[in-house]
C-alpha cells in the first residue's frame, strides 16, 4: 500500500476488490505504530477497528454495504464520546472517563460503518 490515499481513491479500490477493508485498516494501524513518537493519538482501538473492518468486508461480499465509504478507517477527535472508549478531551481530569453513550458525531460515523481506529 502506498503512503497515502484520498477517501475517494480508497472507496474505488474497495469497490473494485483491489484491497480489503482489513488490509487498509491494518496498514493504517502500522503507520500509527511507526509514528508513535509523534504522540498524535490518545487512544488506539486496534481490536475494534479490525473487527469493524472484517464486518465491512463481509458486507461487501454479500453486497450489503451501508455507504460507499463502508470499511474506510477513520480517526475521531477525542472530544466526541464513544460508548465504552476512554474519552479525555486531552485532559488529565477526564483520564478515566469512559462514556456509556455515543455522541451524535460517532453515531453518524457508525451509520456509515467506518472502522474507528483512534481518538486524536
Question: For the regions a protein language model found, what residue spans apply to each?
Answer:
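An N-terminal boundary/leader segment
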Residues: 1-50
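Residues within well-ordered alpha-helices
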Residues: 9-10, 104-106
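Short alpha-helical functional segments enriched in proximate histidine and acidic residues
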Residues: 31, 35, 52, 56, ...
Amino acid at each position: 500500500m502506498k503512503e497515502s490515499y484520498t477517501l475517494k481513491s480508497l472507496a474505488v479500490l474497495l469497490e473494485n476488490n483491489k484491497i480489503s477493508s482489513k488490509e487498509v485498516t491494518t496498514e493504517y494501524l502500522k503507520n500509527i505504530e511507526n509514528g508513535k513518537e509523534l504522540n498524535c493519538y490518545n487512544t488506539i482501538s486496534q481490536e475494534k477497528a479490525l473487527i469493524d473492518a472484517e464486518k465491512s468486508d463481509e458486507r461487501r461480499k454479500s453486497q450489503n454495504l451501508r455507504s460507499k465509504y463502508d470499511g474506510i478507517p477513520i480517526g475521531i477527535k477525542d472530544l466526541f464520546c464513544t460508548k465504552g472508549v476512554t474519552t479525555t478531551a486531552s485532559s488529565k481530569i477526564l483520564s478515566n472517563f469512559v462514556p456509556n453513550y455515543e455522541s451524535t458525531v460517532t453515531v453518524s460515523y457508525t451509520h456509515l460503518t467506518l472502522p474507528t481506529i483512534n481518538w486524536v
